[in-house]
Amino acid sequence: MVSKKVYFLTSNPHKAKEVSDVLSQFSIEVVPLKGEKLEIQADSVEEVARFAAEEAKKRFKERPLLLEDSGLFVDALKGFPGPYSNYVYRTLGLEGLLKLMEGVEDRRARFVCAAALVKEDDKIVIEVGEVEGEIAYEPRGDKGFGFDPIFVPLGYEKTFAELGEEVKKRISHRARAFMKIAKHLSGE
Amino acid sequence: MVSKKVYFLTSNPHKAKEVSDVLSQFSIEVVPLKGEKLEIQADSVEEVARFAAEEAKKRFKERPLLLEDSGLFVDALKGFPGPYSNYVYRTLGLEGLLKLMEGVEDRRARFVCAAALVKEDDKIVIEVGEVEGEIAYEPRGDKGFGFDPIFVPLGYEKTFAELGEEVKKRISHRARAFMKIAKHLSGE
């Protein structure tokens, strides 16, 4: 099978690794493109990813160009921290989120990833992947990054940070979004 | 004294009223310009206001054009909620912020406002106003908006929501930023 090359705009090496793990299963080679994407304030990761893709396509000439935005949406907190998950992780941390969930019985949450593809013809495709789960009562595990140590995906008893890449590359929000993107790339 | 007219881009009627209260003291008339400003994700309100002003000056022809971005920065929470104060107010609310501060002795916080002025010659001026204070232990008062009911400015025992506009128009972050802006407008 001929391998295809795509560029992935990110400043997060964890994300580059995860996207590469997913796309390599489709014989797609991921070339990290170091740089900042422009992120707007919006209530959905789709909106953030779409705006970032529109802006990045003017600034970068590499094609196909990928980027993504993702977040943890906690039902009992009206979706918080949502698209601001990175900022909230850096300020409140896992402890802050767990404090907000103290005494809260409804632990349901979902990770959502919006992946954006800027195609050779400059058209933009957005695909969204989600994984449902629950917020744990304490951090567990040391794999992954961000809120992984307190997220238990539906059907599992371990957190993403305990399960690690073998499971994440099959069921994570990012895996699900980029598997859909892989179909667009193979079809090009 | 000749009154001068300025346009203020906002979707928040409370902010329009507060800015008008401040600038009317300088014989400056504020005309609200209804519309959304484009807000980026950034760790400071200055960055958010500057980007919004650069974008707004392309989209609106009215001059002088004002806009602002503001936020509540809590020391013990590494500045959270900062530039995302509106989102955090809509999701976690006052209760969520108070829950994060449970058992926290260091209550210090500051409201920061970055006011942007797009002048007749399209040059942009940014002025920042701050007010120091503390996070209260429970909400008090029904004036103002946002986090006003849990913010006690330094030198006072009441919250902004108890003190109301007579005090806010003299000492608030927004008042302080727009008093500096008034000097630019009078000097034009």
UniProtKB/Swiss-Prot annotation, chains A, B:
GO MF: dITP diphosphatase activity; ITP diphosphatase activity; metal ion binding; nucleotide binding; ribonucleoside triphosphate phosphatase activity; XTP diphosphatase activity
Reactions catalysed: XTP + H2O = XMP + diphosphate + H(+); dITP + H2O = dIMP + diphosphate + H(+); ITP + H2O = IMP + diphosphate + H(+)
Statement: the UniProt record of this protein carries the keyword Metal-binding: yes
Active site: D69
Any one Gene Ontology cellular component term annotated for this protein: cytoplasm
Known cofactor(s): Mg(2+)
Family that this chain belongs to: Belongs to the HAM1 NTPase family.
Protein name, UniProt field: dITP/XTP pyrophosphatase
